Amino acid sequence: MPSVRKSYDEELLQLDTLLARMGHEAGAAIESALTALRNDDIELARSVVARDSQIDASEHEIEHRCLQLLLRQQPVASDLRKVSTALKMVTDVERIGDQASDIAELVLHLHAKSTDAVGVLEDILKMGDDVLKMVNVLVYNSQPMLCGILPKHHALGLDTAAFPL
């Protein structure tokens, strides 16, 4: 029978894995939405809108696991920071998924209207590329942040150089 601490550590690791997977899903959704926008790909846009429910489901699962950890294990210190960080991150990542869906819906709307808004589209694509870079940094950094707060990124001492645009 595994020790209580080992089981708890495994739950924290599973939480980390789920959050990283959700980050990958949100990043892929942004990337697909931008591709749909660039190529006026209606089917890809529809698939992005449909996948949003998967990201929403991931948010609910992660929130549930975090609350279960808080209630059952009553974490303190660094473990509490890990769980509370996951609760905050999951909300932000879910919002990224929603915005990917919004971009995809814009593709559907623009296609239906047959408008030529090249200047606006270029700005949206540039912003989307910047968001995609930030999501990739988030996913890349989420593993060490949930396994232990990095001193260089601790609390308010975020190193903004970690977000190259």
Regions found by a protein language model. Give the residues of each.
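Cytosolic, long alpha-helical scaffolding segments
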Residues: 1-165
